[in-house]
């Protein structure tokens, strides 16, 4: 009799086990660049419980920008948060990936030069620090300069690397200016007496600078999972955009980005009220994506200027309900 009861209890336990496990959070792996103010959207979504509310356990794998989309294509992550250009270029070359949401909106960078330079026109005949020929920062700078009537032949680009290297090149006098600076290096430059020659936000009104990508295969298998992810991201952006959360957002930047409170406060003001870098709250910006496609086609980084809708999963179109 005891044996029958024991087996009955065991059978009941095995029957209930899958039911209890089904209530566990769905695990999602996300590739992203090393955390800066640009990545605060998914940091907030995790820290403030928005992923948890959507029953998601999101593991973030940080890597260099050029590897983020490659990890998605290789199938080692579920979602990539990447510069839109990396994903668009890959998709244009045949990668089976689609955009499912927006991350950074606009282009929160500045052109910063040494004190003797007062405007972009003053950069004619000068050396300007850039990241690389293939960098989207180079593409955007050349486009803005061309629209100002200053062709690439009028200045020399010296490719030195990322923001720290560009900052140092300007500080040493090796170059006249850096073609793109963002927090905290723009603040450090201004404090040192250097001049802001351009706020890109004055020139570029719509740009889907970064976005979230997923593979076509994964989307077909579990589109609702990605819908929950984007919804949580949107809630995170809504939280960071709320002025009532300014102090808490600054504290989160201090903790997670390992920066001091003064820089964090400057960064918050620059990214949120001034540049509204998360204004789309996860929704794909069609006009901003079209602008990115235009930039890439104009610089021969993609062969064809296709409609922006081509690159977005149908369920995540701005008008999709």
Which role does the model predict for each range below?
Residues 290-321:
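Conserved C-terminal helix/tail region of periplasmic/extracytoplasmic solute-binding proteins
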Residues 220-302:
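Secondary-structure end/capping motifs
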Residues 19-24:
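Sec/Tat signal peptide C-region and signal peptidase I cleavage site
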Residues 26-162, 166-172, 176-183, 196-202, ...:
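Short, glycine-/small- and polar/acidic-enriched structural segments
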Residues 77-82, 171-172, 270-286, 318-321:
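Short amphipathic alpha-helical segments at helix boundaries and their inter-helical linkers
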Residues 1-9:
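Bacterial N-terminal signal peptides that target proteins for export
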Residues 8-18:
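Bacterial N-terminal signal peptides
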Residues 86, 158, 165-257:
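Pocket-lining segment of extracytoplasmic ligand-binding domains
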């Amino acid at each position: 009799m005891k044996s029958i009861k024991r087996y009955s209890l065991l059978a009941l336990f095995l029957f209930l086990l899958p039911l209890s496990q089904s209530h566990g959070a769905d695990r999602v792996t996300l590739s992203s660049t090393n955390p800066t103010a640009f990545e605060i959207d998914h940091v907030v979504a995790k820290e403030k419980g928005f992923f948890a509310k959507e029953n998601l356990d999101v593991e973030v794998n940080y890597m260099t920008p050029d590897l983020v989309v490659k990890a998605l294509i290789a199938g080692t992550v579920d979602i990539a948060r990447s510069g839109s250009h990396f994903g668009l270029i890959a998709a244009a070359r045949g990668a089976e990936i689609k955009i499912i949401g927006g991350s950074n909106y606009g282009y929160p960078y500045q052109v910063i030069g040494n004190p003797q330079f007062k405007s972009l026109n003053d950069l004619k005949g000068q050396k300007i620090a850039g990241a690389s020929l293939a960098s989207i920062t180079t593409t955007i700078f050349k486009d803005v300069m061309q629209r100002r009537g200053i062709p690439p032949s009028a200045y020399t680009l010296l490719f030195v690397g990322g923001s720290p290297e560009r900052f140092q090149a300007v500080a040493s006098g090796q170059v006249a200016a850096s073609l793109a600076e963002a927090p905290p290096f723009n603040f450090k430059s201004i404090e040192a007496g250097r001049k802001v020659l351009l706020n890109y936000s004055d020139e570029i009104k719509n740009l889907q600078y970064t976005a979230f990508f997923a593979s076509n295969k994964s989307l077909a298998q579990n589109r609702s999972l990605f819908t929950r992810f984007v919804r949580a991201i949107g809630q995170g952006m809504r939280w960071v955009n709320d002025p009532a959360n300014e102090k808490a957002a600054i504290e989160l930047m201090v903790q997670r980005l390992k920066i001091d409170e003064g820089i964090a406060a400057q960064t918050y003001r620059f990214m949120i009220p001034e540049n509204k870098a998360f204004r789309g709250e996860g929704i794909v910006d069609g006009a901003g994506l079209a602008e990115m496609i235009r930039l890439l086609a104009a610089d021969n980084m993609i062969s064809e200027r296709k409609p922006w809708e081509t690159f977005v999963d149908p369920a995540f179109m701005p008008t999709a309900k």
